[in-house]
Amino acid sequence: MTDFRHRKTIVLTGASRGIGHATVKRFSREGWRVITCSRQAFAEDCPWPAGPEDHIKVDLSDQEDVGIAVAEIRHRLEAEGGGLHALVNNAGISPKFGDGGRLKSIETSMHVWRDVFQVNFFAPIMLARGLFKELSAAKG
């Protein structure tokens, strides 16, 4: 197990590709401990150290799963004696029609909109509330 007590720690959602993936690489290069969260299991082609041991698979559209992830993040932080210096809620969804067109509020099912709001609005609030103590302790 790696000793992270003397490094800053960031939790980053939506880390498996795009902006999230680039953000992980940047913070890792700067010496931060990066706890990644995404719907996918850790991809072995991701080039940062401690990747698999600091990855949490979580479905942000599922409130219960978010709660489980918060508990796991807190456990990992506590186990290593470190605080949380930053939380980046990068994950987000913007579902489209098959042709790439935007969804219409009247025609799109409420189930889809609930998932969009859960991932884009409620999950970040749940993560911030759940990790507030750790963020405050580290002045994050």
Task: Please place each PLM-identified region on the residue numbering.
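Substrate-binding pocket helix/loop in short-chain dehydrogenase/reductase
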Residues: 98-105, 109-114
